[in-house]
């Protein structure tokens, strides 16, 4: 199965409602879609999200990295030489993790097709069903409460609440949400780097003292501030998860060695794809640190790849793969099957994606 070409397209899907965090507001999913064409007629699908404020990657840079560096490095190679292809992918250009992720995902799709097995089984096969949380965007406490109630009515058992703009207002948001939904639903909070270490400690301890029952807090401080992250971890009882602080396996090893956090959020757009995400999973097993598999605001192609990885590995105990359910429609034929919070993988080779209607 020889790689003959890499073709780039686009997937644009409006959201059901605007997606708001501490750093941005978005109205649609806009992915760069990759198809790897082979001499056998097999096609591998991958995609990448433009997330300039997180990864530094935008649509133009993703396309440029693929067309000008990645394509010329791996076209002509055989999928059976998989490790060699991944080494070329890693080394052909510095950074550009989203572009690398898109191609990596398509390569793994072909790898599964080559050996006639769904990807999650090749990667470990721990389970074939998952349950995701759903994100509640930053808005007024009243609107966030309404959105939370709506999500619970749809069967979601875990909500991820976006905070990080104003600690006092964030605490009010949590109070109003708990009042609206009760205590049977899990709440996670994601500050998206929005707090300073000391204010994070104050806010989280106040949340705990009020009995608001928070499962975890994600990236409370700036990504670069590992000492601040550790300070928060050491001074609160609510488990702290690193997100933007961990892109690479090297980043993961550093925060694990420091015990700067309690958990890690793995995202394929940060790691450069599945191959580096697997290395983080291996490190997490060694250090005994559970992981979440998360996504950016992505469509179903790349999220399906994340679902396969999450299903394969025991160390991935928390799932934040809600991108497809935030979209107003599904333009991807095949792939992971969503029923609100419930995700099921089909036993088709690779990712099980047949095409894209967009």
Swiss-Prot record:
Residue stretches spanning the membrane: none
Taxonomic superkingdom: Bacteria
EC numbers on record: 5.1.1.20
Pathway terms, separated by semicolons: Cell wall degradation; peptidoglycan degradation
Gene3D superfamilies membership: Enolase-like C-terminal domain, Enolase-like, N-terminal domain
Cofactor note: Binds 1 Mg(2+) ion per subunit.
Cofactors named for this entry: Mg(2+)
The entry's keywords: Cell wall biogenesis/degradation, Isomerase, Magnesium, Metal-binding
Enzyme class: isomerase
Described function: Catalyzes the epimerization of L-Ala-D-Glu to L-Ala-L-Glu and has probably a role in the metabolism of the murein peptide, of which L-Ala-D-Glu is a component. Is also able to catalyze the epimerization of L-Ala-D-Asp.
Name of this chain's protein: L-Ala-D/L-Glu epimerase
Species: Clostridium acetobutylicum (strain ATCC 824 / DSM 792 / JCM 1419 / IAM 19013 / LMG 5710 / NBRC 13948 / NRRL B-527 / VKM B-1787 / 2291 / W)
